[in-house]
Amino acid sequence: MAMFEQMRANVGKLLKGIDRYNPENLATLERYVETQAKENAYDLEANLAVLKLYQFNPAFFQTTVTAQILLKALTNLPHTDFTLCKCMIDQAHQEERPIRQILYLGDLLETCHFQAFWQALDENMDLLEGITGFEDSVRKFICHVVGITYQHIDRWLLAEMLGDLTDNQLKVWMSKYGWSADESGQVFICSQEESIKPKNIVEKIDFDSVSSIMASSQ
């Protein structure tokens, strides 16, 4: 994380003003993307600037860097970063490997086909080379979805959704989110009733408004 913090300040200066779109800064920004991947850090603004520079300078397009940007965007689900990044990549490059595979993985995650996601990822593990913390970041997103969707879930299903975790690995994630399991194999997620917070709506009506209504009704 030390290298990331050092580069962050420098990159922040590069992204100010018109210099943001100077192609001479691409090498620095691309190294910054690689540092994010290695140190499990993230800077969406800088990554979008890289993709914008690729749009303006197609000859400088780097497939590997773009793939890293997309994978980092996936680690920030449920935020819309992945969609933002995808929209800045032209159709021809979207058809290239490994970008095509990453877009497919993103589609599986966004549509909550979690078991299919892990299966597809297992067949393309080379995509994660140089990417630190990707799988656990995805598991955080899946736990977020489970937390707002389920009250109870089968233990075996939860393990599958999180990537075929072992029993001990599953216990770690359950403990992290305060989930408990009973003897029947059911995991208690939360009571939806406890999650519902009523809103008190108060409308302030001044005297002039009331008097005008009363006058019009007479």
Swiss-Prot record:
InterPro entries the UniProt entry points to: ARM-type_fold, CSN8_PSD8_EIF3K, eIF3k, PCI_dom, Transl_init_fac_sub12_N_euk, WH-like_DNA-bd_sf, WH_DNA-bd_sf
PTM Phosphothreonine: list the residues. T28
Pfam families (UniProt xref): CSN8_PSD8_EIF3K
Give the primary localization class. Answer: nucleus
Q: Which residues does this entry mark as bearing Phosphoserine? A: S217
Residues with the N-acetylalanine modification: A2
GO CC annotations, alphabetized: cytosol; eukaryotic 43S preinitiation complex; eukaryotic 48S preinitiation complex; eukaryotic translation initiation factor 3 complex; nucleus
List locations, semicolon-separated.
Nucleus; Cytoplasm
Show where the PCI domain sits.
42-204
Give the source's domain of life in one word: Eukaryota
Q: Which UniProt keywords apply?
A: Acetylation, Cytoplasm, Initiation factor, Nucleus, Phosphoprotein, Protein biosynthesis
Q: Which GO terms describe its molecular function?
A: ribosome binding; RNA binding; translation initiation factor activity
Q: GO biological process: what's one of them?
A: translational initiation
Function statement: Component of the eukaryotic translation initiation factor 3 (eIF-3) complex, which is required for several steps in the initiation of protein synthesis. The eIF-3 complex associates with the 40S ribosome and facilitates the recruitment of eIF-1, eIF-1A, eIF-2:GTP:methionyl-tRNAi and eIF-5 to form the 43S pre-initiation complex (43S PIC). The eIF-3 complex stimulates mRNA recruitment to the 43S PIC and scanning of the mRNA for AUG recognition.
Subunit note: Component of the eukaryotic translation initiation factor 3 (eIF-3) complex, which is composed of 13 subunits: EIF3A, EIF3B, EIF3C, EIF3D, EIF3E, EIF3F, EIF3G, EIF3H, EIF3I, EIF3J, EIF3K, EIF3L and EIF3M. The eIF-3 complex appears to include 3 stable modules: module A is composed of EIF3A, EIF3B, EIF3G and EIF3I; module B is composed of EIF3F, EIF3H, and EIF3M; and module C is composed of EIF3C, EIF3D, EIF3E, EIF3K and EIF3L. EIF3C of module C binds EIF3B of module A and EIF3H of module B, thereby linking the three modules. EIF3J is a labile subunit that binds to the eIF-3 complex via EIF3B.
By sequence similarity, the record places it as follows:
Belongs to the eIF-3 subunit K family.
Supply the name of the protein: Eukaryotic translation initiation factor 3 subunit K
